[in-house]
Amino acid sequence: QMRDRLAQVSDQEFQRSRVEILSGLMRLRQICDTPALFMEDYQGASGKLDSLRDLLVQVADGGHRVLIFSQFKGMLEKIEQELPDLGMTSFKITGSTPAKERQDMTKTFNQGERDAFLISLKAGGVGLNLTGADTVILVDLWWNPAVEAQAIGRAHRMGQEETVEVYRLVTRGTIEEKIQELQEQKKHLVSQVLDGTESRGSLTLAEIREILGISEAST
């Protein structure tokens, strides 16, 4: 439905509907995590959560400790609910977590307490030195190289002696694959979609069509 609309919309109409269209892009990204982030009454499965669950079983069986990043607070909450069933304990930091709590949780985690650390994008770049982990899982699209490196860097710090394994979760056949394909050829475009700066007016109609795979012939 969104593709059909954007295939026909003019630049003038796009400018009038920019907020609505960009909100639609955000919903598509949330649905890639789990439709439950967008549909409150959704009771179905999530391929990404299923894959994450399988990966976390391997992490736990291998005696590893993990940092799990997501841009969406709701996704972190879903993951947090899954961990007890896997026999895993966790800490969680979001943008609203007070600085003192962050410091206390970071210190305790690095001393060996708990198995996982859930971190939101907004909180991930602020003074976190989590050398207690040897595995990093990027749940959402993080193909802005600077942001991805920053997330991985939470575990790569002075004193980290173990190799850090990094996993990215990509939902097949979705907008995530399209953005992955565009990573090298349009890094600035990918960055705007992932860090939210598209709302500032820099993302054009043509670029959104490219993300959604709408060809010029269909416009």
Could you say what each language-model-derived stretch is?
Residues 3-128, 198-199, 205-219:
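Conserved Helicase C-terminal RecA-like lobe
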Residues 89, 101, 105, 109, ...:
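SF2 helicase/translocase ATPase core recognition
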Residues 1-12, 59, 176-190:
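Charged, low-complexity, helix-prone segments enriched in Lys/Glu/Asp/Gln
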